[in-house]
Amino acid sequence: MIQGPKPDLQSPSLALPKDMSSREIDQFLTCGRVGRLGMILPEGGPYIVPVGYGYGDGKIYFHTCSEGLKMEILQANPNVCFEVDESISDCSLAKSVIIFGRAEIIADKKEMIPYLEKLIDKYRVPVTFGEYMKKGNRDVQEELEQVRVGLITPHKITGQKFVRKNGNF
């Protein structure tokens, strides 16, 4: 067992957990860069993978390949958990949002494109999706065949922040 000094519970720098408001959660999810998608393997074990994501209209969206372990898992069991966090300094100041929901896979190109455009904009890809399509990239249609968009509809969202006793994050 690891032992160390006991925390000074009276210290003004001690970070205490506090629930985030709906507004704080929305702002945090909008600004987040990487989320962790938690799923259950067909044999019952956990599987978690980091993904770039977007957030809008109360839903999480991400792009993925049309084939692979993630797709196999989501097709077998669409119930997911999605987590985004941020920490400052020594991790004593942190924020974390956890979403419990159901993932839907979008394969229709017309439905996927608005989500892909938002992801391109968020991650500052130097060309818009429309420009990419117009450039005559011969592989673009093949690439679209290999891409899917995952859309998570939450049924529960929790958010916590660890703040110092003086209220600072």
Task: List each model region and its residues.
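Beta-strand-connecting loop/turn residues
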Residues: G58-K59, P78, H155
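A generic structural signal for nonpolar/aromatic side chains embedded in well-ordered alpha-helices
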Residues: L29, I73-L74, L119
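Short beta-strand segments
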Residues: G32-S66, L74, E83
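Anion-coordinating catalytic cores for phosphoryl-, nucleotidyl-, and glycosidic chemistry
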Residues: P17, M71, F82
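Short, solvent-exposed loop/turn elements at beta->coil junctions and helix N-caps
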Residues: M39-P42, S87, K135-V140
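Short, basic/aromatic recognition patches
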Residues: D8-R36
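Active-site-adjacent structural patch at catalytic or cofactor/ligand-binding sites
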Residues: C65-S66, A76-E86, K95-E104
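Charged, gly/pro-rich active-site loop segments
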Residues: M1-L16, C91-F169
